[in-house]
Curated annotation (Swiss-Prot):
Gene from which the chain derives: OST4
GO cellular component, one term: endoplasmic reticulum membrane
Subunit record text: Component of the oligosaccharyltransferase (OST) complex, which appears to exist in two assemblies comprising OST1, OST2, OST4, OST5, STT3, SWP1, WPB1, and either OST3 or OST6. OST assembly occurs through the formation of 3 subcomplexes. Subcomplex 1 contains OST1 and OST5, subcomplex 2 contains STT3, OST3, and OST4, and subcomplex 3 contains OST2, WBP1, and SWP1. Interacts with SEC61, SBH1 and SSS1.
Spans through the membrane: 10-28
UniProt family annotation: Belongs to the OST4 family.
Annotated function: Subunit of the oligosaccharyl transferase (OST) complex that catalyzes the initial transfer of a defined glycan (Glc(3)Man(9)GlcNAc(2) in eukaryotes) from the lipid carrier dolichol-pyrophosphate to an asparagine residue within an Asn-X-Ser/Thr consensus motif in nascent polypeptide chains, the first step in protein N-glycosylation. N-glycosylation occurs cotranslationally and the complex associates with the Sec61 complex at the channel-forming translocon complex that mediates protein translocation across the endoplasmic reticulum (ER). All subunits are required for a maximal enzyme activity.
InterPro entries: Oligosaccaryltransferase (IPR018943), Ost4p_sf (IPR036330)
Name of the featured protein: Dolichyl-diphosphooligosaccharide--protein glycosyltransferase subunit OST4
Organism taxonomic ancestry: Eukaryota, Fungi, Dikarya, Ascomycota, Saccharomycotina
Subcellular location: Endoplasmic reticulum membrane
UniProt key word Lipoprotein: no
Keyword Transport belongs to the record: no
Primary location recorded for the protein, binned into one broad class: endoplasmic reticulum
Outcome (variant: residue 24 to K): Disrupts interaction between OST3 and STT3
GO biological process entries: protein N-linked glycosylation
Amino acid sequence: MISDEQLNSLAITFGIVMMTLIVIYHAVDSTMSPKN
């Protein structure tokens, strides 16, 4: 059984990773295909 502390740290880590991937994706997307 997962404890609350493990679940909390897992959720925070997952959230940070997702935000980082989204930011990187948008940065690469705007760099590779500049909007005219």
